[in-house]
C-alpha cells in the first residue's frame, strides 16, 4: 500500500470539500484524513493501492460542485508518519 499527501489549492474551504473527500475515500476504500490548512488549502493524507490513489487524485482535481480547484500537489508520505485506520476529517 502506498501513502500520498495531496495539497488541494483554490476555493476549497467552506464548500464541503472535506466531507466530499470523506465520501470519495470511503467509497474507494482509502484510509487517511482531510484537514483545512491556514493558507486556505486542504491537505489530504491517503493510503491505498496505486490505482485507487490515482483515481482519488483525479477526483481531487475536480472537487465537489461548489469548489474551484486550481491545482493539486502530490508528495510521498514518509513511512514513519502514521495513517489513520478509516478516514478522518480534522
What are these regions (language model features)?
Residues 1-90:
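Intrinsically disordered, low-complexity, mixed-charge
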